[in-house]
Amino acid sequence: MITGRTALYGVVGHPVAHSRSPEMQNAAFARLGVDAVYVALPVAPERIDEALRGAHALGFQGLNVTVPHKPRAASLCHALDPVATAVGAANTLRRTRDGWDGFNTDAPACRTLLEAAGVVRGSRALLVGAGGAARAAAWALVQLGTEVRVAARREEAAAELCRDLAAAVPGADLAAADFEDLEAEADAAAVVVNGTSVGLPGHEGRLPPLRFRAAQVVLDFVYGDTELARAARAAGARLVSGEQVLVRQGALAFTIWTGQPAPEADMARALEAREGAR
């Protein structure tokens, strides 16, 4: 039951109606008996500054941040954890007296999942995209010791990501790749990561069709039955799904907000239940 004492949490994004975070986080609160509610908050890009101020004024205790707000959210926080600082994007905010502390849970979630999928030091990785999710994936790939090639439709965005991460992480091996050569780059890579919003509801555009092989690891930040995920499964590649990333980063966010270990299995089941009801 929601009362006057119920703590408020939410996710801000544009679009955000598709988000599965409310089911997942509310399942976690219910499992541990936390008096809290988590809601989706649609926020247009030009209104993110006032939205974060307003959420703080309304008493929200924590927020997740999704497309396209992660880089801007980081710049609006009073303090950032080391990973969010290195990545230049924040996807988890925790309330302080005067504002928000920012964290990046996408990056450690990616690292854990990619390592579990068998990514090894010295392997070559293709990262598609240069936004907040791609920056988190770049950090994870660098931490795992891979040679990262970044391809984005805007070449300057890919180059900027490479410069920023190279400055933040000594010894990082990053270079921009030509988006027009995406198919060849994917063929040469042991790891392929989609850090774009292609496949999200409301986002136009497609990636060129990529051919995968069984030895590759493929991570798609976008959850659901995406074209990329279908191609990876058909080829027998080791797929890290958007749902896996969502659960892992969401569990880390839950712990940041509550100080309690997240009931990750319950969170995953909540996503599966929604998928089964569709």
UniProtKB/Swiss-Prot annotation:
Does the UniProt entry include the keyword NADP? yes
Metabolic or biological pathway, per its Swiss-Prot or TrEMBL entry: Metabolic intermediate biosynthesis; chorismate biosynthesis; chorismate from D-erythrose 4-phosphate and phosphoenolpyruvate: step 4/7
Q: Where does NADP(+) bind?
A: G129, A130, G131, G132, A133, F221, G242
For the ligand (shikimate), the binding residues are S19, R20, S21, T66, N91, D106, Y223
Mind telling me which Gene3D superfamilies this protein's record contains? Leucine Dehydrogenase, chain A, domain 1, NAD(P)-binding Rossmann-like Domain
Q: Which UniProt keywords apply?
A: Amino-acid biosynthesis, Aromatic amino acid biosynthesis, NADP, Oxidoreductase
Q: What class of enzyme is it?
A: oxidoreductase
Which residues are named in the active-site annotation? K70 (proton acceptor)
Catalytic activity field:
shikimate + NADP(+) = 3-dehydroshikimate + NADPH + H(+)
The protein's matches in InterPro entries, at most eight in alphabetical order, are given as:
Aminoacid_DH-like_N_sf (IPR046346), NAD(P)-bd_dom_sf (IPR036291), SDH_C (IPR041121), Shikimate_DH-bd_N (IPR013708), Shikimate_DH_fam (IPR022893), Shikm_DH/Glu-tRNA_Rdtase (IPR006151)
**MF annotations from Gene Ontology:** shikimate 3-dehydrogenase (NADP+) activity
EC id: 1.1.1.25
Please state which protein family the record places this protein in. Belongs to the shikimate dehydrogenase family.
- Free-text function comment from the UniProt entry: Involved in the biosynthesis of the chorismate, which leads to the biosynthesis of aromatic amino acids. Catalyzes the reversible NADPH linked reduction of 3-dehydroshikimate (DHSA) to yield shikimate (SA).
Q: Spell out the HAMAP family in the cross-references.
A: Shikimate_DH_AroE
The name this protein carries in UniProt is Shikimate dehydrogenase (NADP(+))
